[in-house]
Amino acid sequence: MNINDITIPFQVDLSNCSKEPIHIPGLIQPHGVLLVLQEVDLTILQVSNNTFNILGRHPEQLLNQHLSCLLEAEQLSLLKDCLAQEDLQIINPLEFIIKSHNESISFDVIAHRSNNLLILELEANLSDKTHSFFRFYHLVKLAMLKLQGTATTTEISQILAQEVRKITGFDRVMVYRFDEQWNGKVIAEVKPEYLTSYLGLNYPASDIPQQARKLYSQNWLRLIPDAKYQPVPIVPINNPLNDQPLDLSRSVLRSVSPLHIEYMQNMGVTASMSISIMKNQKLWGLIACHHQSPKYIPYEIRSACEFLGQMTSVEMSAKEDSEDTEDKIQVKSVHSKLVQYMSAENDFINALIDHQPNILDLVKAQGAAVCFNGNSCTVGQVPPMPDIQVLVEWMSQNIHEEIFATDSLATVYPDAEKLRDVASGLIALSISRSQKNYILWFRPEVVRTVDWGGNPHKPVEVIANGEIRLSPRKSFDLWKETVLLKSQPWKSHEVNAALELRSAIIGIVLQKADELAQLNIELERSNQELDAFAYIASHDLKEPLRGIHNYSNFLMEDYGEIIDAPGKEKLLTLIRLTQRMEDLIDSLLHFSRLGRVDLSMQDTDLNEIVHRILDMLSGRIEETGVEIRILQLLPVVYCDRIQIGEVFSNLIANSIKYNDKANKWIEIGYIDNPPLPPTFYVRDNGIGIREKHFETIFRIFKRLHSPSKYGGGTGAGLTIAKKIVERHGGKIWVESTYGEGSTFYFTLQDV
């Protein structure tokens, strides 16, 4: 089978390409010799099958022999001294003279270790070392000065391409940068005019699969002098010590994938060299060198290029970080202000949205939503609220990370396709996934055209026998693709800023919760003291008031004949005032007792309660002619029957009292809304209440009318009703149209 053919008899799976074991090909390129030794005794275990051509010795003459069969004693001693180094990279290359075919040949020897084996790779060196050193030292020094004088990554990339071409003499030199999906783009290029330009073209991640990128991360430089080479096998194919293929990950002679060779041939490239550019120990890009004819680059020149790549990686990282510095400072400033706003306000949501800058400015989003405790607040351009709620539900079930960022939401969440105008990009920050508390940032779709070097979607071809063959594309002509459903990508520091905001929110919310808990403790203590004071004060005041009231009556009865009319009137006023004060004190005493008496909870039929109240009020009902409407049976609830009876009594009595209509009516019922508790109501067509008084009416002794109107009263009834309802874990509120009537609603929860 020809090693350039890879046939796939079944369904094409591009992941197979990424699984090709390119680090253990069992083959090398023919421009050098590979020796595998047992380091402890320098016994030769494996050799490349071209030793006779280069070293004048057949493989069988070398296998299982000591390295002294090739090297003189002085050279062996030097090698042993060098092997004391932990990292052999610092000693490379060693220069050894070896006799081959009755001729002494100088070799560059490149050493490295692999799985406790010593690997020596020999390349013939015919150059003038002294002349080469000074020449390339000058070139590299000049290149570094030029690179240090650049201001942006674009400038440094162009200078880098120019200088590498000057040092190596390759026809074309490009700087190729990876994006987050490992697609590559040519961002700088130097070439002769007759060659087609690749500048600005994009190449799919499949062109340089994952395992190839891993090797680029381990080795700074890779040379292919002639793509038409015949690979040289390693003899024996497996290492005799462990019967495993030899790991050539760090080998400079390692044979490359047949797919890569075909890729080069399809591009019209015969020789190539790649130099890695790293940032934060991650592959950032490549310096890609192409030549139309075979081209061998000596090791010292490759070393100069490798050094240039390493220095460029440092410069590139610094330049790129510098380009983002101003933006990062701005983000930090926005973050600090948001924290200040949240610390100063009780509601952190309003703090994030209502000020300038707000959460949009933190990540340069066009819209944002804060979803917290079932409520959502938005700012900017956002999806409709129902779509946000569905998205939050999907997030809570499918995304388990604290932060999720994508510039193509529809890729993972197909329903987002209809939201492309506002939500093609998303950062979702989970405050509490279980409670579905999120902050969402949105970016709209940005339709753009990507220029590809050939069609990136055609990795296969059908050959004559009908088989499907995985093959690099044959055309690298400009191929345009319109990219939809993608937003402007999020920068890493923007995502990090959102994540830092989460920590700030949690810290502030916890702080506010602690402060609120302390306030609640103080409030509870104050309420208990106030209840105790009200109870004692009302109890102690009743006795003197009763005395004043009684003695006023005694004066009227015993001395009424001798008291003149003005005196009698003043005495009657005193009796009325003391009676009213006694009524107020009774109400206060009753109100204070509500908080001191335990609830007597039991299953209670509210129909019985309401009918008992109506019987008690029957006289007033007949007197006023009010119509009582009960449209449905009321449920059985778990409550304190006496206290809930008092709630209905107060509400029904008020509906009778505050009604000036000729045809009066009162409706009593409830609204069933599972799984929520039922909502009870008392509705009338009375005088109504202005909206500004909806809260006021529940304050103790707060009346909206003078005591002489609508039959008087203490103004404590609704306050007592509110306290009873709240002790049952419910709430009470009013809806009313002034002049038309009111509806009082209340809920109860099992306590």
Swiss-Prot record:
Signal peptide (UniProt feature, chain positions): none
Binding of a tetrapyrrole, residues: 17
SUPFAM superfamilies cross-referenced by the UniProt entry: ATPase domain of HSP90 chaperone/DNA topoisomerase II/histidine kinase, GAF domain-like, Homodimeric domain of signal transducing histidine kinase, PYP-like sensor domain (PAS domain)
Pfam families: GAF (PF01590), HATPase_c (PF02518), HisKA (PF00512), PAS_2 (PF08446), PHY (PF00360)
EC numbers on record: 2.7.13.3
Residues modified as Phosphohistidine: 539
Enzyme class: transferase
Keyword Hydrolase: no
A biological process term (GO) from this entry: osmosensory signaling via phosphorelay pathway
Chain segments carrying region Chromophore binding domain: 22-511
PROSITE patterns listed in its UniProt record: HIS_KIN, PHYTOCHROME_2
Matching InterPro entries: GAF, GAF-like_dom_sf, HATPase_C_sf, His_kinase_dom, HisK_dim/P_dom, HisK_dim/P_sf, Light-responsive_reg, PAS-like_dom_sf
Catalytic activity: ATP + protein L-histidine = ADP + protein N-phospho-L-histidine
Post-translational modification remark: Contains one covalently linked tetrapyrrole chromophore.
Domain GAF stretches: 152-320
All residue ranges annotated as the Histidine kinase domain in the record: 536-751
Similarity annotation: In the N-terminal section; belongs to the phytochrome family.
Function text: Photoreceptor which exists in two forms that are reversibly interconvertible by light: the R form that absorbs maximally in the red region of the spectrum and the FR form that absorbs maximally in the far-red region.
Protein name: Cyanobacterial phytochrome B
Organism field: Nostoc sp. (strain PCC 7120 / SAG 25.82 / UTEX 2576)
